[in-house]
Curated annotation (Swiss-Prot):
Family annotation (Pfam families): Chorismate_synt (PF01264)
EC number: 4.2.3.5
Catalytic activities: 5-O-(1-carboxyvinyl)-3-phosphoshikimate = chorismate + phosphate
Note accompanying the cofactor annotation: Reduced FMN (FMNH(2)).
CDD domains: Chorismate_synthase (cd07304)
Family: Belongs to the chorismate synthase family.
Record's keyword annotation contains Amino-acid biosynthesis: yes
Name of the featured protein: Chorismate synthase
GO molecular function: chorismate synthase activity; FMN binding
Length: 383
């Protein structure tokens, strides 16, 4: 079973990640992870925190000589901003009670978390609820992506909407791969420029913008997941992974919500067969998933991100101590983090797919898994 745990606060010493269940023999270096972390920090619209941090993952355990050992992998990402916060965020009793937060921000975990955990200082909630934690998720997803690459499964991501600006044409694989060259990870240059302008306008108004990201995965064989039980359906597992990303409020697979307006004759994908290729679908409205299983086509998933709720012109709130009306507190934040969310979403998809592969084919050593997957792919072509 592939799983990971993360620990760490936004302004703590750093973020820790434990990855368990990765087979032995997978080539893995710091650089494989740091490429993903750098992309997560990129994207037009990020705030001052990204000017401080230079995320670099350090592999502490589970890898020797550039190859995984099959034992748990330990990763650490230092927070450079810790220098400015160590007196406040120290784990010991010497921690100084400063920068106390008592005015919860609408749209954040502040109020609900404070009520659940009986915290008067909402910093004890927001530090962990912060999207800073997604750096650890991306590190785990990057490890999974390395395994997928060794199994000839590739990932791409791009931004399809920021605020009012939308990419209206379908983006092909090559264009999606080039999207990282855009300051907003948009595959359409004209739309990308309009997105930058929209972000700048929101910045000047003290506002924030959300958007929609798309993740593609190709080389995924048919049959991953299962129709047998609700919790084994791969579409459900992918949706849960995407919905768990902070600020994500909706997920689409394939044509998504658009199929609700179509008759069945136009909503589904016909089945075809070609000798040497096997069964395939000439169209891909299903987004590569049918009945809880992959169907052999490219996976297409979208996630909708709400605007960041930390505002320079805060919304009305109530002070937890005085119970009096107040404006919400302000924390350092971004104007738009949609490009970063695209990277986090791709990492989440990579993690779920890697787990599904290991469940399907088993094996504790990479060459064994490669051999089993190759035999299965041959079966799909020759059936």
């Amino acid at each position: 079973m592939l799983r990971y745990l993360t620990a760490g606060e936004s302004h703590g010493r750093g973020l820790s990640v434990i990855v368990e269940g990765l087979p032995a023999g997978v080539p893995l270096t710091d650089g494989d992870i740091n490429t993903w972390l750098t992309r997560r920090q990129g994207g037009y619209g990020r705030g001052g925190r990204m000017a401080i941090e230079r995320d670099q993952a350090e592999i502490l355990a589970g890898v020797r000589g550039g190859l995984t050992l099959g034992s748990p992998i330990a990763l650490f990402i230092a927070n450079r901003d810790w220098e400015n916060w160590q007196e406040i965020m120290a784990p010991g009793p010497e921690a100084r009670a400063a920068r106390v937060v008592t005015r919860p921000r609408p749209g954040h975990a502040d109020l609900a978390g404070g009520l659940k955990y009986h915290q008067a200082d909402l910093r004890n909630i927001l530090e962990r609820a912060s999207a800073r934690e997604t750096a650890a998720r991306v590190a785990a997803g990057a490890v999974a992506a390395v395994l997928l690459k060794e199994l000839a499964i590739e990932l791409a991501f791009h931004v399809v909407r920021i605020g009012p600006v939308e990419v209206r044409e379908q983006v092909d694989w090559e264009a999606a791969c080039r999207a990282v060259e855009s300051p907003v990870y948009c595959a359409d240059p004209e739309a990308g420029r309009a997105m930058v302008a929209a972000i700048e306008e929101a910045r000047q108004q003290g506002d924030t913008l959300g958007g929609v990201v798309e993740v593609l995965a190709r080389g995924v064989p048919a049959g991953l997941g299962s129709h047998v039980h609700w919790d084994r359906r791969l579409d459900g597992r992918l949706a849960q992974a995407l919905m768990s990303i902070p600020a994500i409020k909706g997920v689409e697979i394939g044509a998504g919500f658009r199929v609700a307006a179509l008759p069945g004759s136009r909503a589904h994908d016909a089945i075809a067969y070609r000798k040497g290729q096997g069964f395939y679908h000439p169209t891909n409205r299903a987004g590569g998933l049918e009945g809880g299983l992959t169907n052999g086509e490219t996976l297409v998933l979208r996630a909708a991100m709400k605007p960041i709720p930390t505002l320079m012109h805060p919304l009305p709130s109530v002070d937890l101590v005085t119970k009096q009306p107040a404006t919400a507190s302000i924390e350092r934040s971004d104007v738009c983090a949609v490009p970063a969310a695209a990277v986090v979403a791709a990492a989440a998809v990579a993690w779920v797919l890697a787990g599904a592969i290991l469940e399907q084919f088993g094996g504790d050593y990479l060459p064994v898994i490669q051999e089993r997957l190759a035999a299965y792919r041959q079966y799909l072509q020759e059936i």
